[in-house]
Structure formats: structure tokens, C-alpha cells
Amino acid sequence: MNNVPSTSRENSRNPSESSSSIQDLLINVEANDLSSVVNEDVSITMSAPPSPATPRKIDFSAEIETPKSTGIRRRLTLKDSIGSDLENDPESTPAIRKPSRISYDERLTVICDSQTSSPLQTPSPSQERDSAPFADVFQPKGFFSFFWEELTRGYSLHNDHARFSEKRRKVYAFLRIPLELEQFLTYGLLQCIDAFFYLFTFLPLRFLMSIFGALLRIKRWTSAETCDFLKVVIIVAASMLIREIDSSFLYHQVRSQGVIKLYIFYNMLEVADRLFSSLGQDIFDALLWTANSEKRFSVGYFIRTCGHLIVAILYATLHSFLVILQATTLNVAFNSHNQTVLAIMMSNNFVELKGSVFKKFAKANLFQMACSDVRERFHIFALLFVVMIRNMTAVNWNIDSFTEMIPDIIMVVGCEYFVDWLKHAFITKFNEINAEVYKDFTITIAFDVIRSRDQSAFSDYSDQVSRRMGFIPIPLSIMIIRVLSQTFTLDNWGSCIIFGIGWLLVFAVKICNGVVMLGQACHHVKRFRDIQARAEFELFRKRMVEKKSKSAPNSPRMSLIDFTDVLHQPAAGKGFTVSDMLSQWEELQPSLLSSEIRRSTDRETAVSHLTARSDERTPRRAVSMAHIPRRDRSEPPPAPSMDQDPQLDTEDPVVTENNTNSNSEQASPVKKKTTAAPVTSSASTNTNATSSDELADVTAYKMPEQGVQRIE
């Protein structure tokens, strides 16, 4: 009787008490798991050294049991048991027992190679702080131990492979700088020679042609002929003014000065020459623009033009006098007895090296310095020519005197070359500039050569060289005329014949130099176009395809570095250059072989579709340089809106089907299922296929729903 009420009393127990007992059971299980893990760690850490006779063997083939996996398995077992208790009769369920395979007295033994090794222990944080790195190395040593260690210690450079590889690459780049620099300077020197010889050969011929053409009324007077006329007037007027200067008096005045005064005077002349060069081209541009922009045959026009012409003549006279002083000072240095003056003047180049190497340089500043070096190199050649003519005239053209001057000339030129090599090598090293940057500079001045041959050129080629490199040939030409007029006199037929032969020789050199220079310019620009096409096709095709927004960004392109002149440099345009491309050539090279076949197939397909659809113009996403002086301004025909599609399908299904197939075949970043409108005759007349031999800029378009518009 007593058992029945007790049973019913247990069955009618409050559910809250049962839930609390389950929570207590879960807490106890988790505590037991935690205690078992802690005991296991403690037993591993604090275990005594095992006996070598009875080592414990570890079965590596068995499944590794971690504390985390053990706890998860126990929780799953506990939940299953609790669920069965709630569903079944609580009395029939046996007591829950913790399934554990870990025994509290079990110890893990680690067998070491050495029988006398200490057990594995984890160092405390205090021990880690107290123990200094390389504690076993920084130990006091005796005399013999230190001696033996110095003899037998070893090291390996492969432990820092990346750093030493980078050092070797920098050394190779440092040694490549003179070669890359000389390629640029040589091509720039050809341009200076072309601009200088132009004043003695083609400018007089153009002047005579314009005068006779205007007198005989064969052709109209143009602005180019006005510029040629003004240049001839400036050269003739300044030459007549320079003839009043006594060069012998200048020579003796300079020679009577001391060594230090000559050194300071020569440095002052160099600084003044650079300042005059930066100002001279602006004066000439102002004169030429005033003579061609104002209303002609008016009083104000003649007053302004004459004022600018007088200023230009005065500038040319002063600059020519400055150059003559430089040549006279250099001649005094050559004729000095101990040549101390010449050595001191040559040391001025190393002072320039000190002032430029340790400055921060960007690519634009390096281009400015390289162009200035081209001008200085041609300038020193002109001065040496004048010194040689003066000395040979003084000794009645004795060959022995010329052989005595050759070592001094070689020393001056060699010092100039050596200082330029060191200067550019250390500037590129300290500023982390790639050696391929000189290819960018060469392409930039080659672009000037091609642009000057265009029919729509805005200036003469000699003026473009002056703006680019700061080289003004007019003062040098006036100095050459002054020296040659003192050296040779045209008082007999023999002198006239020699003068004619010399002029024909200069004329032949000018033509040959122009042909070589133009051929090199075409080669450089063509190479730039090929590299640009490969870069755009291989590196940026995937990114342009993935851009599926309505306004696609401008296609990245390899831009030419464009500078207005040598002393006023704008910021370089964004884009990839040849040096950036060649630095990533290893990434691009493996895919070139596979892409050549694909590109040839794509070109053949494009040509076939272009001839088949001569009345249609498809939008171009990226076209590699096709025409340098102008951008491609042609726009594709507008696409119809969505509400006109049913009508077009019913009216002309044949044209719609053809246009849909052609649009699906073109490489487009966004594929839309829209049908193109029939192309009218006006759209077909505006369609012009771009030749593969031309150069054009890259154009990106955005694709709205109503049509195609170009992003400016």
C-alpha cells in the first residue's frame, strides 16, 4: 500500500523539476569533460621520465581522439539518451553513464633518441621573456675556440634568396643604363643636327622660293613663308651686329684673367646660356604668332610685328655674344701652358654630378634632364668645332697642331660622356626607376618627328626640337657664321668653290640624317604600337569583358609621355608606358604564342564580316593607336528602342536577322538581345574602315538603352 502512493507521487512530479535535473546533468557532464581534459594535459606535462625498459607503444594507425571530438560525441549521446527518456517510461530507462575512454591515471610517454634527455615541458611566459634570441650564439669564447670557429663557421646566401636576387637585378640595371642612355642621346643628337643644318640648307632655299613666288605671283603667301622670312631676317641682322665685335680683343681680355676668375666666369656663362635658352623660344613664338595672327596691312599690325622683331634680334645678338664668350674661354683653356684651366673647367661636370644625384627625381624630371644633356652635348661639340677652327687658322692649318689638340678634345668629350653615365645611373638607382624608361623617352621624341611631317603640323620641326629639348639653333648658327666669315674670305674663285663643296656636303648630310631619323622614328612608333596591341589584348581583355555596367570605364592604354618643353613640364598622363609593359614581359610572354593564332583568326573573321556588311558600322570598344595627330571621331549608328522591335520584326525580318547575327558575333562586354535598326544610306556613307597601318587612340564607349554614345 505504501508503494502505490509513492509511485503516483513520483509520476505526478512537477515538470520544472525534471527540466532542472536535466540541466544539472548537462552541467555535470561538461564539467567532467573539462576535468578529464585538464587531467590529461597535466599528466602529459608533469609525468615523470618513463622507464626505458617498458616504453609505451603508440599505435599510429588508430584514429586520433581529440578533446573536442570527444566532447561533441558525449553531447550527442547525452541528447539521444535524454530524448529516449522523455518518450519512454522513465523507470525503465537505466541510469545515464558518462561514456569516457580516458582514464585519470593514464600517462603519455614520449620516446626520445637520447636516453638522458629531459621530458617535454612547456616554458612559462616568464622564461620566454628572460631567454634572449640566439642565446647559444652570444656566449663568451676563448682564444682557441674563437680561432677555430672563425675557420670553420659556414653560411649560405640561399637563406635570403629574394634579397640577393633583387640586388643582382639592380646591378645589372645599373650597368645597362649607359647603353639605354646612349641610344636616347644619340637619337636626340640626330634631331639637333637636323634642326641645326636646316638653317643652312633648306631655310635659304625656302626663303628664295617664297620671295620669287611672291614676286612672280606664282602662289599665295602663307604663314609658313612668313615664319621663314622672319627667321632669315633675324639671322642676317644679328650676324651683322656680331661682326662689330672684335674677337681678338675678347681673347686677350679673357686670357689676362686668373685661373679662379676664368672658372667662375665660365660657370656664369653656362648658367646664363641655360636662362637665355629657356627665354629665347618664347620670344620667337611670340614674334611668329604676332606676325600671323593680327590683321595684316594695318598700322597696329606693323607696329606690333616690328616691336617683336626688334626684341628677337636683340635677344639673338646677346645670346650669340654669350656663346662666343664661351668659345673664347674654352679656347684660352686649350692654349694655356699647363692646362690647369682646362682641368678646372672639366671638374665643373663633377660638381653638376654632386648637385643632381642626391635629389628626388620622377620620370618627368628625368626626361627633362635627359633632353638637357642632349642639348649640352651638341653645344659642347659646336664649341669644340669653333676652338679647332680658331687654332688651325692661327697655325696656318698645320696638321701637327691638330694632332696635339686631339688628346684634349678626347678628354673633354670623354669627361662629358662619363659624367652623364654616372649621373643617370645613380639617379635611376636611388629613385627606383627602371632602365626601360629611356625607351619611353625615345618614343616621345620619335613621335615629334612623325608629327612634324604631317600636313596639319602646327610648327616647324626645328621649333619643336627647341621646345622639347631647349635647343635653339639660331644663336649657334650666328656664331658659326661669324667664325667662318673670319676664317674664310670669298675674294677668289678657289674660296667660292671650297664654299660650294662644303655647302653641298652639309646638304647631303642633312638629307641622309633626315632619312635615317625618320626611319628610326617609324620603327620606334611601330614597335610601340605592337607592344600596345599585345598588352591591351592579353592583359586587359578579361577585365573589359567582365565590366557589365552601363557606363564602361575608359580602356587602359599605353600613353606616350607628352611634355611641352624642357623647362615647363606638365604632369605625365595616366596609362601604361613601354617601360611598365617590358617590366611585366615575363607574365605576358607565355600567352603570346597561343594568342597569335587566335588573333590571326579573329582578324580574318573581322575582315570578312566588314566586307560583307559594308553598309553597317559597329561600335568599337578599344582600337589600338591608329592615327597619331587626330582621334577617331566617327560614331556608330544609334540602336532602336525596345518599343520599336515588334514593328521592325514584321516589316523587315531579313535585315533584322542579319543584324542580330552580326551583333552577336562582335566582342562586346554586354550582350543584349536587341535587334538593330536597318542602316540607312547616310550611315553607310560615313563608314570608313581604319587601316591597320595607321595609328589611333583608344576609345571607350558606354552602352545606354537608347543608343551608343562615346565617353569623352
Curated annotation (Swiss-Prot):
Its main location: membrane. The keyword Transport does not apply. It is found in: Membrane. InterPro entries: Tatp1. One of its GO terms (cellular component) is endoplasmic reticulum membrane. Signal peptide: none annotated. This is Protein TAPT1 homolog.
